C-alpha cells in the first residue's frame, strides 16, 4: 500500500515509528508536511498538491495533526477523503474530539462516566458554577489547552473565583471540573486501536504536581486495567468515532471517569512503557480495514 503520514515533523518519534513499521511491512510510506499541502477543491477531480506536484495513488492516510493546526489539518484530511483515500481517523471525528466541551457533551449523552463539569459565560454565574461542581478544590481548564497547559487546581472557592474571572477577562473559554482527590495525581492512558485496548499505562504526576502529563514531568508505568476501564475506553473511542485513540481515565470512588479522548496519541510513552509495537499494530489495522472509499462518512465531510 502507499500510505501518507500527515505530520509537520518527520523526526518526531511517533512519525518515525509509523514510517518504520509501515516500511517493515512492505508499504511505501510518504511523510507530508500538513501545512505545505494545498488543495484544488472546486475541480471535478479533487486534488491535493505538495511541493508543486499532485499527491496521487495513495491507499491510506495517517493523520498526526497537532492541536495548533487542527483547522487546516482537517481540511487536508477531508480532501484525502474526497479523493477516496482511507483515513486512519476521519476528519469529522478529529474535529469532534478537539472540541473538549462537545466531546464531554457527547460522552455524557451516552452515559459514560465523567467528572462533574460546568461551563459558563457570565462572571455573575461564577459562584453557582463553583457550587455546581461540588465546590473547591476544583480544576479549571482552558478549552484550547494541550499537554496540561492551561489547567489550574484551585484549593479554595476564593482562589477559583479569581482564576475564573481572570480567564474570562482574557476572553478564554474555560470549563470547571470537580477535583478527583482519590486519583492521587494519576491517570490511565488506554491506547485503543479498532475495537481493542492494545496497551495501557499509568501516568503519575511528579510530587507537588497534579497534572500527570509526561510533558509536565510525569512518570509512566505498566498497569493492569479492569474490565470496566477497558469497556469505558472502547465506548469513549466509539462515541467519538475514532479508530485510534488515547483515552485518559481517572480511577474514582464511583468508577472510571473519562478525562479526555485524544485523536493523535503519542507513541513514545506507550511503546517505551509497555514494550509493545504499537506502530506495527496501527499499520496492521490499516491493512485489515483500509481500502478505497472506506470512510464511514463516505467522504461526505
Swiss-Prot record:
SUPFAM superfamilies according to UniProt: Glutathione synthetase ATP-binding domain-like
List of residues binding Mg(2+) 2: 260, 262
EC number(s) per entry: 6.3.2.-
Residues binding Mn(2+) 1, per UniProt: 248, 260
One function term, GO molecular function aspect: metal ion binding
Cofactor(s) this protein requires: Mg(2+); Mn(2+)
GO BP of this protein: protein modification process; SOS response; translation
Domain ATP-grasp: 104-287
Alphabetized InterPro entries for the sequence: ATP-grasp, ATP-grasp_RimK-type, ATP_grasp_subdomain_1, RimK, Rimk_N, Rp_bS6_RimK/Lys_biosynth_LsyX
Cellular component terms (Gene Ontology): cytoplasm
Residues annotated to bind ATP: 141, 178-179, 187, 211-213
Residues noted as binding Mn(2+) 2 in the record, renumbered to the chain: 260, 262
Record's keyword terms, sorted: ATP-binding, Ligase, Magnesium, Manganese, Metal-binding, Nucleotide-binding, Protein biosynthesis
Transmembrane segments: none
The record's free-text note on cofactor binding: Binds 2 magnesium or manganese ions per subunit.
KW Metal-binding (keyword) present: yes
Binding site for Mg(2+) 1: 248, 260
Pfam name, any one: Rimk_N
Enzyme class name: ligase
Family: Belongs to the RimK family.
PANTHER family, alphabetized: RIBOSOMAL PROTEIN BS6--L-GLUTAMATE LIGASE, RIBOSOMAL PROTEIN S6 MODIFICATION PROTEIN
Protein name: Probable alpha-L-glutamate ligase
Encoding gene per record: rimK
Amino acid at each position: 500500500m502507499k500510505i501518507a503520514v500527515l505530520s509537520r515533523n518527520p523526526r518526531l518519534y511517533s512519525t518515525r515509528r509509523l514510517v518504520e513499521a509501515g516500511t517493515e511491512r512492505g508499504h511505501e510510506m510518504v511523510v507530508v508536511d500538513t501545512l505545505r499541502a494545498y488543495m484544488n477543491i472546486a475541480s471535478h477531480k479533487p486534488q491535493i498538491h505538495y511541493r508543486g506536484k499532485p499527491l496521487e495513488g495513495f491507499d491510506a492516510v495517517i493523520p498526526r495533526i497537532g492541536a495548533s493546526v487542527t483547522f487546516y489539518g482537517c481540511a487536508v484530511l477531508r480532501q484525502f477523503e474526497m479523493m477516496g483515500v482511507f483515513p486512519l481517523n476521519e476528519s469529522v471525528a478529529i474535529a469532534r474530539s478537539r472540541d473538549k466541551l462537545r466531546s464531554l457533551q457527547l460522552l455524557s449523552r451516552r452515559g459514560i462516566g465523567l467528572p462533574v463539569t460546568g461551563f459558563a459565560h457570565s462572571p455573575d454565574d461564577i459562584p453557582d458554577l463553583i457550587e455546581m461542581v461540588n465546590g473547591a478544590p476544583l480544576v479549571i481548564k482552558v478549552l484550547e489547552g494541550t499537554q496540561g497547559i492551561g489547567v489550574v487546581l484551585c484549593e479554595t472557592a476564593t482562589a477559583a473565583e479569581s482564576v475564573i474571572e481572570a480567564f474570562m477577562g482574557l476572553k478564554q473559554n474555560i470549563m470547571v471540573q470537580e477535583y478527583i482527590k482519590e486519583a492521587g495525581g494519576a491517570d490511565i492512558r488506554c491506547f485503543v486501536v479498532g475495537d481493542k485496548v492494545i496497551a495501557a499505562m499509568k501516568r503519575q504526576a511528579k510530587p507537588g504536581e497534579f497534572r500527570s502529563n509526561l510533558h509536565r514531568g510525569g512518570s509512566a508505568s505498566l498497569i493492569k486495567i479492569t474490565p470496566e476501564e477497558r469497556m469505558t475506553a472502547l465506548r469513549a473511542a466509539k462515541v467519538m468515532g475514532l479508530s485510534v485513540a488515547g483515552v485518559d481515565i481517572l480511577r474514582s470512588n464511583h468508577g472510571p471517569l473519562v478525562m479526555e479522548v485524544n485523536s493523535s496519541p503519542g507513541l513514545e510513552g506507550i511503546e517505551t512503557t509497555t514494550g509493545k509495537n504499537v506502530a506495527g499494530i496501527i499499520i496492521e489495522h490499516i491493512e485489515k480495514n483500509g481500502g478505497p472509499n472506506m470512510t464511514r462518512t463516505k467522504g461526505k465531510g
